[in-house]
Amino acid sequence: MSASLPSLAFAGLGLMGVPMCRRLLAAGYPLAVWNRSPGKRELLAAEGAKAVEVPAELAADAEILMLCLADTAAVREVVFGAGGIVENARPGQLLVDFSSAEPAATREMAAELEARCGVRWVDAPVSGGTPGAESGSLAIMAGGRAADIERLRPVLSRLGQRLTRMGEVGAGQVTKVCNQMIVACNALVIAEVGALAERAGVDASLVAPALAGGFADSKPLQILAPQMAESRYEPVKWHVRTLLKDLDTAVKLSREQGAATPMSGLAAQLMRLHGSQGYLERDPATLVEQYRTAVE
């Protein structure tokens, strides 16, 4: 089966990367993997992937190079740093970046990679969290040449229920910024709602089912409100650190574009405050703890 499928390589085996790789392996794709910490590489090697020691080895055989990394700096290091992908990259390959990165930096890196070795870049950040990665129901927002995105569609269909081309390189990252503005502001309001319901004597565990199907309903509400009501913060499905990074990107982008985003600016400061109290690596459901102290 794998002989007729393109060979893939994947860098970044975090909360999202591992389940995404598992879906690609289950579909029969030949897959090489790299992660900074070897434990995740070994985990997927035991499931059929080829583990490599440095990112450059990913580009030796793969037709499609995939990244799912923490931030813009990590993407730049894996692609252009010592032992990076650029050392073995060649014309005809495609690089697909699932990371949430800065749009301007994405455009710059894409131009540099194509100029240096002829590899084209598609930014394809995703939304749907670990449940979406596990079930293959992610929403994928892509930026790049239309032909390149169509070439990727069969592979990406294993990972997402919807792939939308938003424009040229960088457009996917702009769309992800918009997505994260909505998600992060929503998470903060849900935390306020949960704490208020508790203090007013309402069973906060009933809020999400009571509002289901109404105008206030959302996936974040249905996921976060029950966790907050139960103070159930494990296992960590996403990180406060990630939301803060994305809000900072939103504020930076709005400044560059001359756009007003006051709610996201305030959300960034509230998220930073929460992170400074030891919650950066915790689940955003912990945001409710910020509001459980009475205001006299």
Which residues fall in each region the model found?
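NAD(P)+-binding Rossmann beta1-loop-alpha1 motif at the extreme N-terminus of oxidoreductases
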Residues: 1-67, 98-99, 108, 130
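Rossmann-fold NAD(P) dinucleotide-binding segment
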Residues: 55-67, 71-120
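Rossmann-fold dinucleotide-binding core
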Residues: 100-180
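Active-site-proximal catalytic alpha-helix in oxidoreductases
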Residues: 135-142, 164, 168-200, 209-223, ...
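Beta-strand segments within the central parallel beta-sheet cores of soluble alpha/beta enzyme folds
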Residues: 205-213, 265-269
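Interdomain hinge/lid region at the active-site interface
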Residues: 219-280, 284
